[in-house]
């Protein structure tokens, strides 16, 4: 039962209580760049989840034989190999989306979430829990991407996953889209708003002030 509860906590905590974007403020760059459309946000979320999960798994499996002096190089090699596989699969099965995501899939290699979980968790934990930790953090990251992507695409273009929800005035409808939501800075403000709301509702996530207490 203890193992089951621990596995459940490892998998689910990155959604709200320890979200990599909302609490740790990691992976912001890609969150700004790929969330103007749900298709790109979903694919990026899936790619990061797969890479984080399996990199954690493989690193945990060999953690006892990795020399401490080269552990970062080994971690980056494993992560880079997985990213190459994901990128090639994306090009093979969805070339148009691959072009839209451009360099951002390749930049998963340097994503702080992937490297951070490999170093902080996978190097110290058994394979199964490491895999769940990677999947959980990938899903937590993806949850925010999809939330931001939904708001930006619906308000910015009146569609969701490319499906028209509100007919725009340009097409004879009534909806006037807010093009500002399709610009990258809008994602920055949305994520900032989400962080503010979450930390207001969950004061324990607020950082201590310089005087050593939380307001």
From Swiss-Prot:
Enzyme Commission number(s): 7.2.1.1
Tell me which stretches of the chain form a coiled coil: none
| Catalysed transformations (reactions) | a ubiquinone + n Na(+)(in) + NADH + H(+) = a ubiquinol + n Na(+)(out) + NAD(+)
Q: Which Pfam families match?
A: Rnf-Nqr
Q: Where the protein is mainly located, per its record?
A: membrane
Q: Which InterPro entries match?
A: NqrD, NqrDE/RnfAE
Which keywords appear in this protein's UniProt record, sorted alphabetically?
A: Cell inner membrane, Cell membrane, Ion transport, Membrane, NAD, Sodium, Sodium transport, Translocase, Transmembrane, Transmembrane helix, Transport, Ubiquinone
* Subcellular localization(s) per the UniProt record: Cell inner membrane
Cite the GO molecular-function annotations of the record: oxidoreductase activity, acting on NAD(P)H, quinone or similar compound as acceptor
Q: How does it sit in the membrane?
A: Multi-pass membrane protein
Indicate the family of this protein.
Belongs to the NqrDE/RnfAE family.
Q: What is this protein called?
A: Na(+)-translocating NADH-quinone reductase subunit D
Q: What is the lineage of its organism?
A: Bacteria, Pseudomonadati, Pseudomonadota, Gammaproteobacteria, Aeromonadales
Task: Identify the coding gene.
Answer: nqrD
């Amino acid at each position: 039962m203890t193992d089951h509860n621990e596995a459940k906590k490892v998998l689910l905590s990155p959604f709200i209580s320890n979200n990599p974007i909302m609490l740790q403020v990691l992976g912001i760059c890609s969150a700004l760049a790929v969330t103007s459309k749900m298709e790109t946000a979903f694919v990026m979320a899936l790619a990061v989840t797969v890479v984080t999960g399996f990199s954690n798994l493989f690193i945990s499996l060999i953690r006892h034989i990795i020399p401490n002096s080269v552990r970062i190089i080994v971690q980056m090699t494993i992560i880079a190999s997985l990213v190459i596989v994901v990128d090639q699969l994306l090009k093979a099965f969805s070339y148009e989306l691959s072009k839209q995501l451009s360099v951002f899939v390749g930049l998963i290699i340097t994503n702080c979430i992937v490297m951070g979980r490999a170093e902080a968790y996978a190097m110290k934990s058994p394979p199964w829990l490491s895999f769940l930790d990677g999947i959980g953090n990938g899903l937590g990251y993806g949850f925010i991407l999809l939330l931001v992507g939904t708001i930006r695409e619906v308000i910015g273009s009146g569609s969701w996953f490319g499906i028209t929800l509100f007919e725009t005035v340009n097409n004879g409808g009534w909806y006037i889209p807010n093009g500002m939501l399709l610009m990258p800075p809008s994602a920055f403000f949305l994520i900032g708003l989400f962080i503010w709301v979450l930390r207001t509702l969950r004061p324990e996530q607020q950082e201590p002030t310089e005087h050593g207490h939380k307001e």
